[in-house]
């Protein structure tokens, strides 16, 4: 973690900062997959053989692009659109519906629907979050609302289609995974065939946690998480408040720089920190009253944010261990002596106080990374804030990529279609196919 953030000039630099140091595809296609919202389509897969179709967009049979509306704005062709998911009657206290959204955060879209229905967050259930800067489809349940009421919802860039009644609420993880249809522009299409071949030959891609896990605009969560795990609360708060990144606003950068140069003047910092940095101001308000009470200042953050810091540091350690495994040439899809295996795949630890480390060379890698970081599994039992302690887990080294295909639709444009099981990051696949630049949305 001893990196000068001023050196993080490219997304490749940022990837290395969060532990993603290796790739299996040495020369990707380049390009961008975020030029248009319609370039990134995500469809939930309840099972391996089914997916929730998107009706908000259709494909032009002429140019191959995806658009909203009925006709292609470029060539005038009638767009080919999917049919609605079939509805059914059913019984139960929850109504299952399809949510399609265009450039909406998942929970903001659900809350907007909740306002229309006069229902709070806890009435809704979802199986998983979907990308914001994308067109997405997924199932949602809502308690105590008849299907007819859902048909009356009219919100810009949201389509709601009731399916029927069910007995239980959808819960996180109630899905097989997601299907992706992604258009990559300004690409070197000559490199596409080789990149696809490498990924298919491996059976997937390294199962890294992508940059968005750490904060795409300000990837500071794992840095804070390290000091949370070490229970160095002043250092954790110092990094959270003062660590600046070039993709932040000038106002935020100036405030962080001022506090770094005037550490301890928390009343003065409240005059400098802008109102939109509300979590930072919560901490500063506490420290202005109780200057050395860092642990309770940190408690001013919501529980889920405090947990997020610990999870981010676990993810960073996972990425570093996976990178070192690749650097040493150990296989990702086949176990070697000493590996801890799940579903036939070698696993990498998300370290925690209950974590079992591997033996042999895989275990040597795991222990050496923890030693370099100066942490032990027992450190994740956080005695001064036990509610954010982490028992740990293990996760496969390889992310299986299913139903992978690609089609070149112009001299520098291609469409790639693939499915990932739940927990898999599309960015992990795309950074291999394309390289890091152009993968992450602003």
Regions found by a protein language model. Name each.
Residues 424-428:
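Pseudouridine synthase
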